[in-house]
Amino acid sequence: MSTTGLSHASDTTRLVIPDLDAGLNFLSRLPLANPLQSEVSLNQFFDSLLQSPPAALTYLNLLEQTRVPLCFVEEELARRYVNKPLPPGDVEAQAFDQVVEVWRKVTRAYSQCAQLDSDADDPEHPLRVALVLHRCLYYTTMIIVEHYRARREIPAGVWLDLHGYYASAEEWGVATYPLADALDPHGRSTHCMAAYVMALLMDVSGPYSLSVRDQGIVRRWATQWAPLVSIHGAEPGEALPPFAVDLMQDTGLKSISDSLNTSQLRRLDTSRLAMVLTQVRQQLAQKLSPAQIGLGEDCSVGHCRRLLDHLARPWTQARAARKFRRQAASGIAKVGAGFEAMHFFISGKEFSQPENVRMYSRQDFDTLFVFRQMDDPTAKLQIQQGTQVARPDEWEVVNQSANGFRLMRSIAGAKIAHGQLLAVCPHDGDRFILAQVTWLMQDRSGGLVAGIAALPGTPQAIATRLLSGHTGKAELYTQAFLLPAVDAINAPQSLVLPVGWFQPSRVIEIYSETPVRVRLDHILQDGPDFERVSYVLEK
C-alpha cells in the first residue's frame, strides 16, 4: 500500500495520520480483495488514531469513513469461525479473537474522539455526541453478535458497557436523535435507542439455539423493527412488565424479580412490535411472499412462520411456559457422534454388509483359504471389516426434562456442532438413544454446554442403500436408523438417514432381517449431518 501523504515516527515504523486527506488516501487504498491484508491495514490505521489522535472533527470523519470497509472485511474474516463445530481449532480461534479485538478497538477510538470534542457550545455538538454513542452501541453489539455466531459465552463487562453507552445517551438527551447510517441498505435513519433495542431483541431470541443462518435473519428483523420499541424508566408505583433491563447488571433483558434497584430499571414498550408481528404472520397466512412484506428474499414462507413463532413470545415479553419441566440431575452421560459410531453404540456391534450384497477383497479370500480347515462349513462367512470405533465422550448431566438434557463437558473430546445428531446413553440408563443438539455454547473457561432433544422412539440400527436404477451398479448398504411411531406425541414412524439422501418419493431399500423397499415421504427433522424422514412401504 502506498503511504503518500502519510508520515511515520522517526524511531518506529508506526503509522501517523496527520490530517483528513492523508487518512482518506490511506483508506482509499485498502486492498479489499485481500481481507487479511485489509485487516492488518485497518488495525494499523486504528492504532495510529488511538496513539496520535488528530483533531476531534477529523477523527470523527475518519472513523465514519471506515464503517463500510471495516464491516465488509470483518464479515469476510468471520467466515473462518462462523458455522464451525466446537471446540474451535487454532485458526478459527485466532480469527475470532482478531475480529472481536477490532470491534473493541474501534469502540475505544470513538470514545476517545468524544473525549477530544470539548466544544459543547457548538450547535452540532449534540449531533456528534449522539453519533459517537450510537457507534459505540453498534460496535459493542457487534462484540455480542460475534460471540453468538461463534457460540461463545459473552465476556464479563460487555453488557455493562452497552448499558453505560445507552445511559449516556439518555443523560445527554440524544437517545432518539435521528442519525444517518451508511450500513443500512435502504438508507433509513436510526438512533441510539434503536441500536440498544436491537441488541436486547437479539439476546432474548435465544441465539445459542438458532442456526447461524437464522441468527442472521433475526438480526435483520431486529434491526428493522427496533424503532417500534420504546424504552422508559420505572416510575414509582407503576406496574412493570415481566421483563426489564437493569443498567447495573451485566445481563440483557431479564425477569424483574431479580432486580431490586428500580431507579436503574428500564422497561420496554413492545406493543407496536407485537402488532407488527401479528400483522406479518397474518399476511404470511394470506399467501403473501416474505419479500412482499419486508421479511427478505432468503427465507421461505414456512421458514419465516417457524421463526416468527419462535420470536413471538420473547419479543412481546410474554412468559413462555416450558413444554417439558426441567429437573436438576447429576451423573455422566455417554455421547457418540457420526453415523458409524452411533450405529455401533446402538446396535452393540460393528456394521457389516448384509450377506446378499457382501463383497470380499483379495485379502479376505486369502485369509479364508489359509484358514479354511478351521472354518465351520455350515457357518455363514464372517469377515471383520477392521474399522475402529471411537469410545464415547463423557458429558456431565446438569439437568433433564422429559425430552432432553442439558450437558456440559471440558474442552477435551470430539468436536460438536449445533443441530448435529448424537447417540446418547443417559446417566440413569443403559441404552443409547438418538438426540439432536438444539443449544450449544462454549463457556468462558473453554468448556462446552449443550442442550439436546431426544428424537421420538427407541432407535433400531439398520442398513440402507440407494437403488441402482438405470446404472446397473450394485450399491452398498450404509448405516441408518429406524424410529417407531409414537402415538402419544403424534410422531409417525421414520427413518434417520445421512444428509442428502432425501428426495420426495424416492425409493430406497432398508435392511434389518430382510430387505424392504420404502418410499420416502417428507422431512420431519434435519441437521447438518442427518435427515429424519417419514416413509411408506413400497408396494
Predicted regions and their residues:
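Short strand-loop-strand
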Residues: Q317, A321-D430, W439-R444, V449-P459, ...
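Long, leucine/valine-rich, helix-dominated scaffolding and oligomerization segments
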Residues: S2-L201
